[in-house]
Amino acid sequence: MDSLRLISKSIKIEGTPFGSSHQRNQIFLKSVAFFLLIGLAYRFLITNSTVSPVPTVRSSPESLPPDPSGLTAITQTSASVDSPANITTIASQNVSTKCDIFIGNWVPDPSGPIYTNVSCRHIQDYQNCLKNGRPDVNYLRWRWQPRDCDLPRFNPEQFLDNMRNKWLAFIGDSISRNHVQSLLCILSQVEEVEDIFHDKEYKSRIWRFPSYNFTLSVIWSPFLVKAETFENGVPFSDIRVHLDKLDQKWTDQYINFDYVVISGGKWFLKTTIFHENNTVTGCHYCQGKNNMTELGYLYSYRKVLHLVLDFVAEPNHKAQVLFRTTTPDHFENGEWDSGGFCNRTMPFTEGSEGEMKSEDVSMRDIELEEFYKTTTTQQEGSNSNIVLLDTTSMSLLRPDGHPGPYRYPNPFAGLKNKELNQVQNDCLHWCLPGPIDSWNDLMVEVMLNRERQRRE
């Protein structure tokens, strides 16, 4: 407006406004000039003060089908006039778009992990890659970056505060145990846990954070249903799986849980005999034994997931359930028992590297089908208490994050060149610290999103 004042001062009308004709003509011409200059100045100022449009946020062409429970929503807001760029806001109330936090890339993170193999006592020896002599450390310096938004780093103090007087249970196989150990390592940087319970083999355990009255547990249930692997102390050659009976190790405790992370996994690929209504109905990989029908692992996996999801979806159950998807392995040139190895030192990038094995693709397809079937049916009557924790894509991009040969200390010590390929590799579980730590970032965001939706 200072420029308008300067223009106004430069045009002064002298003498009596209605004097002579010559004076009136001068007044008229000066008035016209005055208003023209004001118009031009106004146009100039408005044009140069207009805010540029905020760029449109890209939508993910590879995103999953619409989630009936809204689990992958991270909200984004448009930039304000004072903002230099489009700002991603987690937990915003002004939702303008949804971001699929499960699609993205691993980006360099020089800050590294929250904990180390020295500061955490909960790392099992076969996942303590640095202690076992792994020479590279670059696999520790990456973080997960969703394609269209930012993901907050896990805040252990805030998490413990939010979980005050709560119980979180992990149910599944050794990958679930791997996950809970990662979470323990992060949380123990704030407060060390009390050991409350463990079974004979330390596969099922319960811990407590005393200052927060927060209980954390892991329940060993690799099939999620009743499975018989021993009889009178002698292991079966084939595992007997009851496809219509949930495992009471977790169902008997279920009423206590506030949050549950549950998942299936690789155990369904083992040789198994199927029981339904206490009768043998078929098998997987039974190779013609006793003339049983080969039904395959996909048959059993679908049956079990359907039974599990129906149970946790029952309206009288209070627990909020995070259904975690399958974890791909990264064995190359063989499997765990046939010389397979994983010696990569860098992540893959989205869309350019890394393909899931056919069995992993099939299992993931079944997981998504059964999840959407259950949640869609459930929402017809009420809000779903089940959300998806889709760690498959992000895990596929991390072939560098496994123990590989470093599941034991100094695995190549004393070996000659021709014997190096005889060292057994672990290309399924994850080093601690390692990529699995980022699963907790996703887990927390999914939990927070669900809580926000319940309040709306």
Swiss-Prot record:
Name recorded for this polypeptide: Protein trichome birefringence-like 25
Localization per Swiss-Prot or TrEMBL: Membrane
UniProt gene name: TBL25
Task of the protein: May be involved in the O-acetylation of mannan. May act as a bridging protein that binds pectin and other cell wall polysaccharides. Probably involved in maintaining esterification of pectins.
Key words, A-Z: Membrane, Signal-anchor, Transmembrane, Transmembrane helix
Membrane topology of this protein: Single-pass type II membrane protein
Coiled coil stretches, renumbered: none
Stored InterPro entries: TBL, TBL_C, TBL_N
Residue ranges crossing the lipid bilayer per the database entry: 26-42
Domain of life the protein comes from: Eukaryota
Chain span(s) of sequence motif GDS motif: 172-174
Keyword Membrane recorded: yes
Residue interval(s) of motif DCXHWCLPGXXDXWN motif: 426-440
